Regions:
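Leucine-rich repeat
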Residues: 3-10, 30-36, 56-58, 87-92, ...
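Low-complexity, intrinsically disordered short peptide segments enriched in small/polar/basic residues
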Residues: 7, 16, 93, 97-102, ...
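Conserved hydrophobic position(s) of the canonical leucine-rich repeat
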Residues: 14, 29, 40, 50-53, ...
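Conserved hydrophobic beta-strand positions in leucine-rich repeat
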Residues: 17-19, 32, 43, 56, ...
Length: 147
């Protein structure tokens, strides 16, 4: 999936969703929810994608097991970021979600990450494991994991 028109054609029975590298960077795409895709088991977002997004909602998905976000996705550069907006990532009520991986600089300006009621979560990996690399995830946020 890479074009805005692809979003309209996602089958409700989809189990694996892949957004490629450098995709869905249209200025009109400010909010995205995967909640209508009730059978989704895995979400993969490539590098440098969803660059204008302000809200990403991954909620109430009873089959979701894994979320992977590449580098510099859901990232606005200094010139395009809206400093008056709230940037929100919601991972909530996904009862079998086991793993979340987020690449370097992704969600840098997202100031409201919410990870809630993820009872099967075993692994959260953010940024680089190399201590010399600035990860920059949720740079201005207070991060909390509840439930």
């Amino acid at each position: 999936m890479c074009q805005m028109s692809d979003l309209d054609n996602v089958n409700a029975n989809t189990t694996h969703l892949v957004i490629g590298d450098n995709c869905l960077n249209d200025a009109s795409l400010e909010s995205l929810s995967f909640s209508p895709l009730r059978y989704l088991r895995e979400v993969t977002i490539g590098d440098n994608s969803l660059s204008r997004l302000k809200i990403l909602s991954i909620e109430d998905l009873e089959a979701l097991r894994k979320v992977t976000v590449g580098a510099s996705s859901c990232y606005q550069d200094f010139e395009t970021v809206d400093r008056t907006a709230d940037y929100l990532l919601r991972l909530k009520n996904d009862p079998v979600l086991k793993e979340v991986k987020i690449g370097v600089i992704s969600f840098a300006y997202f100031d409201r990450p919410l990870f809630e009621n993820l009872f099967s979560l075993e692994k959260i990996e953010m940024g680089s494991m190399d201590p010399t690399v600035l990860s920059g995830n949720f740079y201005n946020a207070l991060f909390s994991l509840t439930g």
